[in-house]
Amino acid sequence: MSVPLFEKVAFIGLGLIGSSLARVMIAEGLAKQIVASTRSERTLQDAKALGLIQQGYSDPVEAVQGADLVVLALPVRATQKVLETIKPYLQEHTIITDVGSTKGNVVDA
């Protein structure tokens, strides 16, 4: 097995798209650790039970600590606010990507 590309991937939002990406990352061995933050405790419990994440958080700031990849899988309108919240806690080398359909507000933040 090859060395994973990422040490820690943090998903912010774990709906249909986020959970699908997490599943692929696990199947392909792309990360040593996958964590997520979402508002629903039930979603976090289900994701852990399914083996999609190792740890779940209600606070996105906790999820992004030490992450080298952050995947924003949020409604487009929530993206800018979440980015502003987590930005001070990201490492200099952290890659941030999103799955939203518009990019202007993401680039601005």
List each model region and its residues:
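Rossmann-fold NAD(P)-binding glycine/threonine-rich loop
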Residues: 99-109
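NAD(P)+-binding Rossmann beta1-loop-alpha1 motif at the extreme N-terminus of oxidoreductases
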Residues: 1-65
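Rossmann-like NAD(P)-binding element
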Residues: 60-97
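Alpha-helical structural signal in soluble globular domains
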Residues: 24, 50, 85-89, 109
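Short, function-defining helix-loop hinge/capping sites that tune catalysis or transport
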Residues: 54, 81, 106-108
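Structural motif
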Residues: 12, 37, 73, 97-100
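Short glycine/serine/threonine-rich phosphate/pyrophosphate-binding segments
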Residues: 19-20, 79, 105-106
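Alpha-helix N-cap/helix-start and coil->helix boundary motif
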Residues: 40-41, 76-77, 103
